[in-house]
From Swiss-Prot:
Domain of life assignment: Eukaryota
Molecular function per GO: growth hormone activity; growth hormone receptor binding; metal ion binding
Keyword Disulfide bond applies: yes
Signal peptide: 1-22
Transmembrane segments: none
Compartments it resides in: Secreted
Origin species: Oncorhynchus masou (Cherry salmon)
Name of the protein: Somatotropin
């Protein structure tokens, strides 16, 4: 009986610490989702502003090219649809999100739009991406059980970004900006989706469908 009473405080402290960790985990998820939502909205606005400077024929042509082309981050293996996203573990979604954000740390510094239009807060984009990367890394650390073994998706290297647009031809500057902004918007939407699903799973909500 004495041993039971001795264990009671230990169990209470353990439950308290576990509850505190869960609250902190949700706080970090809330911050991460809020920040990526802001980045996604910013990416959407930047793309729309640039798209609005194009002539109709130019816009159609660039859209056709983009649909047939690929983004630099497409080499990062990620869920191809909502069903795969729902089946993916929280840790997998966090790792993919981390890699996607990491893939934009350098390209974000070149998000300067042609036709004399410059993103006023281009520097802030890089800062926000870096902050979000740190936050996601904290979430990965807080949500892994034991020693994490990295899969191929985590260890692979992206193609050198400097070579990505080297064969665009004479209209490369316009196409480069179009693809940069379109890819940035697409990837921020991906990260927003993955973090939202992961957050929902950890909050034990009844319905986490997309």
């Amino acid at each position: 009986m004495g041993q039971v009473f001795l264990l009671m405080p230990v169990l209470l402290v353990s439950c308290f610490l576990s509850h505190g960790a869960a609250i902190e985990n949700q706080r970090l998820f809330n911050i991460a989702v809020s920040r990526v939502q802001h980045l996604h909205l910013l990416a959407q606005k930047m793309f729309n502003d640039f798209d609005g400077t194009l002539l109709p024929d130019e816009r159609r042509q660039l859209n056709k090219i983009f649909l047939l082309d690929f983004c630099n981050s497409d080499s990062i293996v990620s869920p191809i649809d909502k069903h795969e996203t729902q089946k993916s573990s929280v840790l997998k979604l966090l790792h993919i999100s981390f890699r996607l954000i990491e893939s934009w740390e350098y390209p974000s510094q070149t998000l300067i739009i042609s036709n004399s239009l410059m993103v006023r807060n281009a520097n802030q984009i890089s800062e926000k991406l870096s902050d979000l990367k740190v936050g996601i890394n904290l979430l990965i650390t807080g949500n892994q059980d034991g020693v994490l073994s990295l899969d191929d998706n985590d260890s692979q290297q992206l193609p050198p970004y400097g070579n990505y647009y080297q064969n665009l031809g004479g209209d490369g500057n316009v196409r480069r900006n179009y693809e940069l902004l379109a890819c940035f918007k697409k990837d921020m939407h991906k990260v927003e989706t993955y973090l939202t699903v992961a957050k929902c799973r950890k909050s034990l909500e009844a319905n986490c469908t997309l």
